[in-house]
Amino acid sequence: MERIKELRNLMSQSRTREILTKTTVDHMAIIKKYTSGRQEKNPSLRMKWMMAMKYPITADKRITEMVPERNEQGQTLWSKMSDAGSDRVMVSPLAVTWWNRNGPVTSTVHYPKVYKTYFDKVERLKHGTFGPVHFRNQVKIRRRVDINPGHADLSAKEAQDVIMEVVFPNEVGARILTSESQLTITKEKKEELQDCKISPLMVAYMLERELVRKTRFLPVAGGTSSVYIEVLHLTQGTCWEQMYTPGGEVRNDDIDQSLIIAARNIVRRASVSADPLASLLEMCHSTQIGGTRMVDILRQNPTEEQAVDICKAAMGLRISSSFSFGGFTFKRTSGSSIKREEEVLTGNLQTLKIRVHEGYEEFTMVGKRATAILRKATRRLVQLIVSGRDEQSIAEAIIVAMVFSQEDCMIKAVRGDLNFVNRANQRLNPMHQLLRHFQKDAKVLFQNWGIEHIDNVMGMVGVLPDMTPSTEMSMRGIRVSKMGVDEYSSTERVVVSIDRFLRVRDQRGNVLLSPEEVSETHGTERLTITYSSSMMWEINGPESVLVNTYQWIIRNWETVKIQWSQNPTMLYNKMEFEPFQSLVPKAIRGQYSGFVRTLFQQMRDVLGTFDTTQIIKLLPFAAAPPKQSRMQFSSLTVNVRGSGMRILVRGNSPVFNYNKTTKRLTILGKDAGTLIEDPDESTSGVESAVLRGFLILGKEDRRYGPALSINELSNLAKGEKANVLIGQGDVVLVMKRKRDSSILTDSQTATKRIRMAIN
């Protein structure tokens, strides 16, 4: 205060003002500061000072032929003096105005294409809605956010190659365009930018904006997707916020959002299968998001979310070194600990084996709606400073921190038995047991924690067991702060390992992630997610399982047919029939399976009874473990549309309808595809055509291995013999002819020989 009074006093004297405004600067240090180096030290001042001159701009001499010396108002537009040290002309800012109004106009067709990101932004803002301004304290925390809406997800190197190829195709230098997205973008951009007159450098800059994700570490309270970040300066200040709804979505946000949903669905599904890791990989590789392979997106997309990171770990990609517990991301900021197994007793005298972390450590905890700083010693919470959007979010963070601290009073606060299980019906590990228990009800935990008197610290208040704020008392070691805790800013990624139960560990063996950490929130994806894996058929309900199962049989009919006759057990055990079992009433599954398997065996034994339609229709029922019984069925029940519906053993029904003439299959009125090859009607034709160049030797001979399909015959060498499966599910022995000349006669003799071989 004193200094300010003194300065005011000085300024009131006229001499002070004069010295400060009129005298020249002749102090060597100052002159040095502003004149050494090429870097402009005070750009805004320099600009103001330059623009106050008459001719602040220099231009090529040609300008004098293209711009008149004076404008309509008679003001001079350029000077006859040339610029010192170059052969350029000195030009007035008025010349720019004249040029903008009267200069030549070139084609504008490329502008929206090159400056696409800007044009799109204008559209989003035009259609966006700005709501009221609210004045309130903003809890902002720095998060790594995407500041560049509408970009593809290429790496800097990939983008560089694309840009060089599009903008400077004739430049020397090796460019390798390998990824699908690189090739597509290059082709598209080359077509768009034909005969483009905009400066190549500008085009390159704009392409970079379109191709590469740019992230910044910014203070945010609210939406973090790129369409919100681009208006951050309009929507949140230090003490105010303005409601805003974006006027359009951008693909990069849609991909991030859909990727998280796909990853969560896949991890949830994989964790209940017999081999979670193998299943997860199979699903990641067979899933597409918005038409792009999920594995390609995972390789390029830096989104950090528990399920996404589990998928990345499974693919051998590096992920962030922070770990997840109770939906919060923990990052150790100092300290260290060693792990030791210890047995503890709950309040219900149940024994738990927990891995205790011995040592003093500090962590930041960042969740969706709350953040905290946690300091802990061995089985003791030293201090927790938490901030959050509302009471509920703050309570969630406190529960997670209390459980994580492993304090005895927390374990003693357990009432009742701990027996929580995961989706696969396996018991959760002790730490997650405790977490689930207190997430259900934390009353006893908060009551037993203990209370202390607190000092008055700016920006911090105490919190009582019933979650009310207080300035005098607080739960031991716990304070609520107005300030948020920043997210971990580093983008460093580490090598991790994953076990078959999808637990992800760092190289020291600390568990970073496990399926228990995957959120149960279900959203609706913005881009179409196509799961080709049979494990995901259930996600859209029973009807989808039914349609997909039959579609799979039809698509793979050639191989299915061979397995059906040669190796039925292997066929029945195929994982593609797994989802179907949930549609068959549990009590009767075994009987159905036994019945269908017996029926199929009769078909194999009695020649000429092979019935394509019936095999396709009944095959999924044979997958359940069979029960031997004498029961016969004329129809089999499946549970779809909320009730049991019947599939007729012989003939069509609303559930399964096969049209023999068109070979189209309709399931519940939905088209399930067309059977490419149906030998029932076209026996003689198919075989005689296909067996050209082969001699039929007689009945099947097991010494020549399993039967091949007609398509596989082409791989035989001349003179080689093989069993082959023909139309009616029958197997004959053939030999590939040594000479090509006799091929013509084969088609006539083939038909006769097949009949002889079979009969």
UniProtKB/Swiss-Prot annotation:
<dbReference type="InterPro" id="IPR049114">
    <property type="entry name" value="Flu_PB2_6th"/>
</dbReference>
<keyword id="KW-1191">Eukaryotic host transcription shutoff by virus</keyword>
<dbReference type="GO" id="GO:0006351">
    <property type="term" value="P:DNA-templated transcription"/>
</dbReference>
<protein>
    <recommendedName>
        <fullName>Polymerase basic protein 2</fullName>
    </recommendedName>
</protein>
<keyword id="KW-0945">Host-virus interaction</keyword>
<keyword id="KW-1190">Host gene expression shutoff by virus</keyword>
<keyword id="KW-1262">Eukaryotic host gene expression shutoff by virus</keyword>
<dbReference type="Pfam" id="PF00604">
    <property type="entry name" value="Flu_PB2_5th"/>
</dbReference>
<dbReference type="GO" id="GO:0042025">
    <property type="term" value="C:host cell nucleus"/>
</dbReference>
<dbReference type="Pfam" id="PF20952">
    <property type="entry name" value="Flu_PB2_7th"/>
</dbReference>
<keyword id="KW-1097">Inhibition of host MAVS by virus</keyword>
<dbReference type="GO" id="GO:0039523">
    <property type="term" value="P:symbiont-mediated suppression of host mRNA transcription via inhibition of RNA polymerase II activity"/>
</dbReference>
<dbReference type="InterPro" id="IPR037258">
    <property type="entry name" value="PDB2_C"/>
</dbReference>
<keyword id="KW-1195">Viral transcription</keyword>
<dbReference type="Pfam" id="PF20949">
    <property type="entry name" value="Flu_PB2_3rd"/>
</dbReference>
<dbReference type="Pfam" id="PF20947">
    <property type="entry name" value="Flu_PB2_1st"/>
</dbReference>
<dbReference type="GO" id="GO:0039694">
    <property type="term" value="P:viral RNA genome replication"/>
</dbReference>
<dbReference type="GO" id="GO:0039545">
    <property type="term" value="P:symbiont-mediated suppression of host cytoplasmic pattern recognition receptor signaling pathway via inhibition of MAVS activity"/>
</dbReference>
<dbReference type="InterPro" id="IPR049115">
    <property type="entry name" value="Flu_PB2_C"/>
</dbReference>
<dbReference type="InterPro" id="IPR049111">
    <property type="entry name" value="Flu_PB2_middle"/>
</dbReference>
<dbReference type="InterPro" id="IPR049106">
    <property type="entry name" value="Flu_PB2_N"/>
</dbReference>
<comment type="similarity">
    <text>Belongs to the influenza viruses PB2 family.</text>
</comment>
<keyword id="KW-0507">mRNA processing</keyword>
<dbReference type="GO" id="GO:0039657">
    <property type="term" value="P:symbiont-mediated suppression of host gene expression"/>
</dbReference>
<keyword id="KW-0899">Viral immunoevasion</keyword>
<feature type="short sequence motif" description="Nuclear localization signal">
    <location>
        <begin position="736"/>
        <end position="739"/>
    </location>
</feature>
<dbReference type="InterPro" id="IPR049110">
    <property type="entry name" value="Flu_PB2_2nd"/>
</dbReference>
<comment type="subunit">
    <text>Influenza RNA polymerase is composed of three subunits: PB1, PB2 and PA. Interacts (via N-terminus) with PB1 (via C-terminus). Interacts with nucleoprotein NP (via N-terminus). Interacts (via N-terminus) with host MAVS (via N-terminus); this interaction inhibits host innate immune response.</text>
</comment>
<keyword id="KW-1090">Inhibition of host innate immune response by virus</keyword>
<dbReference type="GO" id="GO:0003968">
    <property type="term" value="F:RNA-directed RNA polymerase activity"/>
</dbReference>
<keyword id="KW-1048">Host nucleus</keyword>
<dbReference type="Pfam" id="PF20948">
    <property type="entry name" value="Flu_PB2_2nd"/>
</dbReference>
<dbReference type="Pfam" id="PF20950">
    <property type="entry name" value="Flu_PB2_4th"/>
</dbReference>
<comment type="function">
    <text>Plays an essential role in transcription initiation and cap-stealing mechanism, in which cellular capped pre-mRNAs are used to generate primers for viral transcription. Recognizes and binds the 7-methylguanosine-containing cap of the target pre-RNA which is subsequently cleaved after 10-13 nucleotides by the viral protein PA. Plays a role in the initiation of the viral genome replication and modulates the activity of the ribonucleoprotein (RNP) complex.</text>
</comment>
<dbReference type="InterPro" id="IPR049113">
    <property type="entry name" value="PB2_helical"/>
</dbReference>
<feature type="site" description="Mammalian adaptation">
    <location>
        <position position="627"/>
    </location>
</feature>
<keyword id="KW-0506">mRNA capping</keyword>
<keyword id="KW-1104">Inhibition of host RNA polymerase II by virus</keyword>
<dbReference type="GO" id="GO:0044423">
    <property type="term" value="C:virion component"/>
</dbReference>
<keyword id="KW-1113">Inhibition of host RLR pathway by virus</keyword>
<keyword id="KW-1045">Host mitochondrion</keyword>
<dbReference type="GO" id="GO:0003723">
    <property type="term" value="F:RNA binding"/>
</dbReference>
